[in-house]
From Swiss-Prot:
Chain intervals with Polar residues compositional bias: 195-204
Location of region: Disordered: 194-220
Keyword terms, alphabetized: Plasmid
Protein name (database record): Uncharacterized protein BBD18
Length: 220
């Protein structure tokens, strides 16, 4: 039996299962994904991005709005994925490069998460259940703040900083700062090495002198 844990993420306490990103297995399965080492939460869609893709979002989530341009809906869904990734990471991925370099199956998986998030946003905002089939197995905790919300520059920066810190790929390339204990240890090692070199120099000098004395001929 899996152990229930409680983890605080972005100032929200979430009950969940051990072994998941942040403790909530159902929420993560529906809305979160690991992309290039970052943990992206596709439920966090700002108002500005909703407005940017307003027609596309209506076509995906509003049953009273119909659009026959399936290709454009697909392209805009992929662009929305890139916009959310850039917002939450501070990276500056290009649409074409990101979409073409990412495995198609992964892009479709991210698209499914986006659609589930948009569907939940629409139903929560309009007090309906038109799109329940997209998230029917996950009706638990969500951060309702994000249903109709535009984060401040400071909040976006906090999300980006956290994501950069949690990214193991970034940690590998990040220059590590030495603490006082490590500095003292290095100083001690350098001191020992200096003493060893000085001792070796003295020994070599003494050996040369002895060889020189033995090599001299006795004068009569």
């Amino acid at each position: 039996m899996q152990k229930e844990i409680t983890i605080n993420y972005n100032e929200y306490t979430i009950g969940g299962i051990k072994g998941t990103f942040f403790g909530n297995s159902q929420y993560e399965a529906n809305y979160r994904a690991k992309i290039n080492g970052f943990i992206i939460d596709f439920f966090k869609i700002p108002i500005s991005l909703k407005k940017k893709y307003e027609l596309n979002i209506k076509a995906l989530s509003d049953p009273n709005f119909s659009s026959t341009n399936i290709a454009m809906n697909c392209i805009n869904t992929f662009k929305l994925i890139v916009d959310i990734v850039n917002m939450q990471t501070g990276e500056n991925y290009d649409y074409d490069t990101f979409i073409t370099k990412t495995d198609t199956e992964k892009m479709l998986k991210y698209g499914t998460k986006i659609i589930a998030a948009l569907a939940r946003h629409f139903d929560e905002q309009n007090k309906t259940n038109f799109n329940e089939s997209y998230y029917e197995w996950e009706k638990g905790w969500i951060d309702k703040k994000w249903i109709n919300y535009e984060p401040t520059a400071e909040e976006i920066k906090e999300i980006q900083i956290m994501n950069q810190k949690l990214n193991p790929l970034k940690l590998k390339h990040r220059k590590k700062n030495l603490n006082n204990g490590q500095i003292r240890l290095l100083q001690a090692i350098n001191k020992i090495e200096d003493q060893s070199q000085q001792q070796a120099t003295k020994s070599n000098s003494k050996t040369k002198k002895l060889k020189g004395n033995h090599g001299e001929k006795t004068k009569i």
